[in-house]
């Protein structure tokens, strides 16, 4: 007796729909949490996002530092030009040696107070 029961891969009949519209697909229950990612995937995505933000922060800080260095360079250049003009004005009124002496004294005082 080697007879097997024939099995077919036919979908079982669901029965008639209540409203009679059997040509429509039957609706499935709405489960919004079923498509969510696993905890490990969320952690990995969060780590990637934090790494990107950290990199962006570093780039912003680097750009800001360059900008401040440029501003400081301009300020130093202006101060040096101003000081040079001031000494030239003093040289018009006074002797050259006295101007040089005042220059040295101001430089000493600047170093002491800085």
UniProtKB/Swiss-Prot annotation:
Name the job this protein performs: Involved in nucleolar integrity and required for processing of the pre-rRNA for the 60S ribosome subunit.
> What family name appears in the similarity comment?
Belongs to the CGR1 family.
Q: What does the organism's lineage look like at the top?
A: Eukaryota, Fungi, Dikarya, Ascomycota, Pezizomycotina
Encoded by which gene?
A: cgrA
| Regions of compositional bias (Basic and acidic residues) in chain numbering | 39-93
> By its UniProt entry, which Pfam families does this protein fall under?
Cgr1
> What is the protein's name according to its record?
rRNA-processing protein cgrA
Keyword Coiled coil recorded: yes
Give the source species.
Answer: Aspergillus fumigatus (strain ATCC MYA-4609 / CBS 101355 / FGSC A1100 / Af293)
Q: Which domain of life is it from?
A: Eukaryota
Q: Which UniProt keywords apply?
A: Coiled coil, Nucleus, Ribosome biogenesis, rRNA processing
């Amino acid at each position: 007796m080697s007879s097997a029961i024939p099995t077919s891969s036919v979908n079982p009949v669901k029965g008639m729909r209540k409203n009679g519209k059997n040509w429509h697909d039957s609706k499935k229950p709405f489960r919004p949490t079923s498509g969510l990612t696993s905890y490990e995937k969320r952690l990995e995505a969060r780590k990637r996002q934090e790494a990107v933000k950290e990199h962006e922060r570093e780039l912003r800080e680097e750009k800001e530092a360059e900008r401040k260095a440029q501003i400081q360079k301009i300020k130093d250049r202006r101060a040096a030009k101003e000081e040079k003009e001031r000494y030239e004005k003093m040289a018009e009124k006074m002797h050259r040696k006295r101007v040089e002496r005042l220059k040295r004294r101001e430089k000493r005082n600047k170093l002491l107070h800085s």
